[in-house]
Structures are given as structure tokens and as C-alpha cells.
Design a protein with these regions (language model features):
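A short helix->loop->beta-strand "cap" motif at the edges of active sites that frequently abuts
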Residues: 32-37, 69, 94-95, 158, ...
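Short acidic-hydrophobic, aromatic-tinged amphipathic segments that line or gate anion-handling sites
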Residues: 98-101, 189-190, 250-258
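A nucleotide-sugar donor-handling region in carbohydrate enzymes
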Residues: 42-139, 165
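Donor-nucleotide binding loops and adjacent catalytic segments primarily
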Residues: 104-204, 255
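Conserved nucleotide-sugar donor-interacting segment of glycosyltransferase catalytic cores
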Residues: 2-66
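C-terminal amphipathic helix plus adjacent low-complexity
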Residues: 264-313
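A donor-sugar binding/catalytic signature common to diverse glycosyltransferases
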Residues: 193-238
Length: 313
């Protein structure tokens, strides 16, 4: 901070850092670089209201957000989850909080046709993408999916790509690979930097409920069955529940996850009509709004105003 002397300091999720490590930096900048502007960036949902309120009171986050930050930006929509009301923001904190909408994910690097050709998928085949995020706790979802395919879709050739995640424990990965490899229409990737391309090519996505994955699903207007994580925080569960109530995806509670139940919901989604733009009323304008908000904040700084002046050519 002393070296960079930032004009704007953007902090993600926790006002003083993951383990309080930003407190000293915030204190330093306050006294040695008072012109720095501060923005706290929050996801649409942090945790349940009782858990979040208790944590913010315990960690003094309300005071920090009110006293140290110029603005709070929430990358979500109040129609889905009104964090300002749910988390009981004070009038002072409400006044500096803005909902930016959801982040529209960029398109993939490969066309759906190229992906389907790569995986040997014909026009008549159905293609399901399974993605349990990083994979650390994704074994149950993938295991149940494979059981559903074996028990309930044995008479159908459904092309499946499982992107297991680089954090899946080695023993669990080996267990899954031993079952996937003998089946010609089942495919495995541990990780891909181009998940959006595979998602765009899929007829259905089966996933957990993390912010990035759900944003990709909604950006691409894909039919999806989401099995959210319910612990240690309720973020994914609340997100999936609210979106399911809005009719933009299907949700299964992990305690209700069985091969038969998953197969039933997948069958219903595979036979439903494709998603169309009119099905979605979600706001996906976070990136342009954030860009505008950055410029508005920085235009107040003399050093930045000089950079914005037109250059004679």
C-alpha cells in the first residue's frame, strides 16, 4: 500500500480481510493516503441472515463497513435476495450500498458444434454436463449421477461429461474414474479453463450452487438441476432455493438426493422446452455498472482526472 498509493481499494467479502490481515493496511492508508477510496464487494448471498448478522456483529464488520468504506457493491439482485434488508444494514450502510446485478459470464472459446463434435455427440444425442465446482465435496453428486444413469437410463445413450474438479480427493477420483472409463459415452475432465464452452453445448447441466457456476448457467440460459451445498454456510442453498422459486432452475436438497429422484428431475428437464430469453428477468448488468461506478469514484481524484483528459493527435 505504501508503494502503490492506491486511488481505489476494492475488498472482497470481508471488510478487514479473510483473517483480519487488511486492518493494518486500512489504518495505514487512512492516515498516510487519505484520498484513497474504498469499496466493499459482496456476493448476492453471504450466509443465512442469523449467521451473517451474528458474524458481522462479532467481527465488527458493520462498523468497519460504515466507517471505512465509501461504497458497498452487491453483485446480485434484491428481487432474488435483498441483503440490505436480510442482513439489517443500518440507514448509513444502506445509503452507500448499491445492487449491481449479476455478472454475465463471457461466452466460451469454442462453439457448441465444436464441443459436440469433439465428444462424438450426434444431433439425436442428449448431452449432460456435470460440474461439482472445485470437487472437494462433490463426490456425492457425481456418484449419485452415475448411479442414476446406470439404474434409470440404461436403455438410453446420454452423453455425459463430468468435470470433477481439481480439489476432489484422490481416492474418490479414482473410484469415479474406474466406473467412468469403461463406458464409451461417459467422459471425464479434472478441470477445464473453458467450462462455458461445454456448458453452452449441453442440453442439461447438473451442478452445485456456487456463484460462478450458477452465473454461467443463467448467462447461457441453460436448463439445470442444482444440488447446493448446505454447510458450513447456507449461501448455495439460499441461492438455489430462491432461483428455483423463480422458475429459472430446478433444485434438489442434498438430503433428498437419490439416484431415482435425480433421474426423475433430469428426465423432466430433458423433455422440457429450451429456455428462452423471456424466461429470465434477472439483471445481468453488473460489469457495465461496476465500470461506471469505478469511473465515478475515480473522477473525483485529481490524479485520475489528468488520465481522463483527451490527448491531442
Amino acid at each position: 500500500a505504501a508503494h502503490f498509493q492506491p486511488d481505489l481499494f476494492l475488498v472482497d467479502k470481508k471488510p478487514n480481510g479473510l483473517q483480519g490481515e487488511l486492518q493494518a493496511t486500512l489504518d495505514y492508508l487512512k492516515y498516510h493516503h487519505p484520498q484513497t477510496r474504498y469499496v466493499l464487494l459482496l456476493r448476492d448471498i453471504l450466509d443465512s441472515a442469523p449467521a451473517t448478522i451474528a458474524q458481522w456483529q462479532r467481527e465488527n464488520y458493520y462498523f468497519l463497513a460504515e466507517s471505512r468504506y465509501d461504497q458497498v457493491w452487491i453483485v446480485g439482485s434484491p428481487e432474488i435476495f435483498n441483503a440490505v434488508e436480510e442482513y439489517r444494514f443500518s440507514p448509513t450502510l444502506k445509503a452507500k450500498t448499491q445492487f449491481m446485478g449479476y455478472i454475465r459470464r463471457p461466452p466460451g472459446l469454442q462453439s457448441p458444434q465444436a464441443i459436440r463434435q469433439k465428444l462424438g455427440i450426434t444431433e439425436k444425442d442428449r448431452f449432460i454436463l456435470v460440474t461439482p465446482g472445485g470437487g472437494k465435496d462433490g463426490f456425492c453428486l457425481v456418484d449419485t449421477y452415475l448411479q442414476a444413469q446406470t439404474q434409470c437410463f440404461s436403455d438410453q445413450k446420454i452423453i455425459s461429461l463430468i468435470v470433477g474438479g481439481s480439489e476432489m480427493p484422490l481416492a474418490q477420483k479414482h473410484d469415479l474414474l474406474a466406473r467412468i472409463r469403461p463406458v464409451s459415452h461417459w467422459h471425464w475432465l479434472e478441470f477445464t479453463p473453458d467450462l462455458a464452452s461445454y456448458m453452452a453445448a449441453a442440453d442439461l447441466v447438473v451442478s452445485m450452487g456456487g456463484y460462478n457456476t450458477v452465473s454461467e448457467i443463467l448467462s447461457l440460459q441453460k436448463r439445470a438441476v442444482v444440488v447446493p451445498r448446505i454447510e458450513p454456510v447456507a449461501e448455495q442453498w439460499i441461492r438455489a432455493q430462491r432461483l428455483a422459486e423463480g422458475g429459472v432452475l430446478r433444485m434438489l436438497h442434498p438430503q433428498q438426493l437419490t439416484p431415482q429422484r435425480l433421474a426423475t428431475v433430469m428426465s423432466e428437464e430433458l423433455t422440457a422446452s429450451p429456455r428462452v430469453a423471456s424466461d429470465y428477468t434477472l439483471d445481468f448488468n453488473a460489469l457495465p455498472r461496476i465500470t461506471e461506478a469505478f469511473l465515478r469514484l475515480l473522477e473525483q481524484e485529481d490524479s485520475f482526472k489528468e488520465l481522463l483528459q483527451p490527448i491531442a493527435v
